[in-house]
Each structure stands twice: as C-alpha cells, then as structure tokens.
Amino acid sequence: MTVAPEGRKLLRLEVRNAETPIERKPPWIRVRARMGPEYTELKSLVRREGLHTVCEEAGCPNIFECWEDREATFLIGGDQCTRRCDFCQIDTGKPAELDRDEPRRVADSVRTMGLRYATVTGVARDDLPDGGAWLYAETVRAIKELNPSTGVELLIPDFNGRPDRLAEVFGSRPEVLAHNVETVPRIFKRIRPAFTYRRSLDVLTAAREAGLVTKSNLILGLGETPDEVRTALADLRGAGCDIITITQYLRPSARHHPVERWVKPEEFVEFARHAEELGFSGVLAGPLVRSSYRAGRLYRQTARARA
C-alpha cells in the first residue's frame, strides 16, 4: 500500500504503521444493538431527510444509546483536515472552500431530529484566516437560535492558542467546551505532531476562565503507561477540566498507529475512580466510551455539581 484512500502518497510513518497487521479485538470489545423506539424513529427520519451525523458515518458503537436519548454529533468544516493525528480516521488534505451556510443546515438538522443535546465537532482549518473560529462559533449560535432548549457541546481544535480565535468561540457560549488532549506528554508529539500538550491544557484553562464547563478525552492503547495516564489526569484537572472521558484506541486502518495494548475493563474502572478522586465532576471510562458518549448526561451531572 503506497497511496492513501484520498489519493495522496502515504507518509513514511503510515508505511511503517502498515507493516503491523490490524489487531484482533479482545472478547470484551463487543457492541450489543438495542434498537428502542427513539432510535428507530431517528434512524428513519435521518434516512428520509438525508441528514448527516458523525454517529452513523463514523460507525460509532454507542449510536443506539445516544439516539435513544435524542443526542447526536455533527462534523463541520468538511471532510479534509489540515492536520494529521496518528489515531484519527479523518483524511488529511486540502479542504474545500468554507461553506458559510453549514451552520444553518446543522441547526435545521438539530430541529428536524428533535435533539435534546447536540455535539458539534470539526476538522482543523489552518487554511482559513481565522482557523475556522467563526464557523465553530456560528454553528453554536445558529443551533441556539433555532433550538433554544437544546444543549450544545462544542469540541474544538486548539486554534494555535490564539486568544482572539478562542474568544470568538467562547463567546458563542456552548453548554460544554471540549478540547481533547488525547494522549500523554511522552508520546504526544509522535501521535499529534501539529498540537502541543501544554497548549492543549492552556486552551482548557482559558475556557474555564471564560466561565465555560470544560471537557477532555484520553485515548488508551497508544503506548502510554498507567502512571502516565494518572499524571495526565492530574494535569487536566489542574488545568481546570471539569469532565473527562477515557477510551480504548481502536485502529481505523492499517496506516494508523498500531494498538499497543488492550486495556482491560477493570483498569478503566480504576482510572475512573482515580479521576473522581482528583475532583472531576463528570467521568466516563470504558473500552467503547467515546468523547461524545452520554454527553448530555455528563453535562447535567456537572451542572448540578457546580450549582
């Protein structure tokens, strides 16, 4: 394999990754499909209206639970990211022109689906003068204007730590501002070369100082040690992070980083306990947890704790 699906030549790192075959999943990585009435209704509505959600397009294992709670996730900014993280399935390349009508369409989708809580995430847009800050902020504003009773969670890139860009995004006042650190300092540069660990922590601190509920995520199985996970959790809490999700890395393709280890369910229980002891007000940890999993429930739990 020398060419990526999007047509570009593979990076040397991707060629090296591809030398390791896709790993066999352990028995505890299994999804049970429970299709309740809310899920069934949303599924038919999405198909009928031609709507697009990350939940379906990324094959999220938690779609049955989230849609039953009337929660869904949307991807904005296109399908090409200007950065490349070694765990992420989104393609790296030159994005299409900015679609200024996208916020309205997302807001319409939220209304059509009757969502109680919507998560919005997107690609990095370093090609734009503002790094995409307007697009992220305007999407929140559009959702809130059309759906005043719907909670909004916004998962952002770091916008290179630029205060003006962060201020634009924070000013849209999502219920939760999320920025995912994803991994520990020792391997951070290898896994997320276009980001820095310190800057990611600073983004969370700035959001907390702006009065927002903050959230982050750690992916396990990328080569970190348990002690490093505990240290990263302490760093995140010290930076002002309110909510943490802890997940198992599942390799999207052979050109992505190999799975270094399968973290056992009991280890996730221990990490969750440690996070709670550190003072996180919302914690979810498990092999199939994803950063937007039960997002509305975690927000409400955190809001009660801060009241």
Curated annotation (Swiss-Prot):
Annotated NCBIfam families: lipA, PRK05481.1, PRK12928.1
Pathway participation: Protein modification; protein lipoylation via endogenous pathway; protein N(6)-(lipoyl)lysine from octanoyl-[acyl-carrier-protein]: step 2/2
Catalysed reactions, semicolon-separated: [[Fe-S] cluster scaffold protein carrying a second [4Fe-4S](2+) cluster] + N(6)-octanoyl-L-lysyl-[protein] + 2 oxidized [2Fe-2S]-[ferredoxin] + 2 S-adenosyl-L-methionine + 4 H(+) = [[Fe-S] cluster scaffold protein] + N(6)-[(R)-dihydrolipoyl]-L-lysyl-[protein] + 4 Fe(3+) + 2 hydrogen sulfide + 2 5'-deoxyadenosine + 2 L-methionine + 2 reduced [2Fe-2S]-[ferredoxin]
GO cellular component, one term: cytoplasm
Primary site of residence: cytoplasm
EC number: 2.8.1.8
Residues involved in [4Fe-4S] cluster 2 binding: 81, 85, 88
Note describing how the cofactor binds: Binds 2 [4Fe-4S] clusters per subunit. One cluster is coordinated with 3 cysteines and an exchangeable S-adenosyl-L-methionine.
The protein, known as: Lipoyl synthase
Matches recorded under PROSITE patterns: RADICAL_SAM
UniProt enzyme class: transferase
UniProt KW Iron keyword: yes
Family of the protein in this entry: Belongs to the radical SAM superfamily. Lipoyl synthase family.
Gene for this chain: lipA
Keywords annotated in UniProt: 4Fe-4S, Cytoplasm, Iron, Iron-sulfur, Metal-binding, S-adenosyl-L-methionine, Transferase
CC cofactor: [4Fe-4S] cluster
Domain Radical SAM core: 67-281
Gene Ontology MF terms in the entry: 4 iron, 4 sulfur cluster binding; lipoate synthase activity; metal ion binding
Superkingdom of the source species: Bacteria
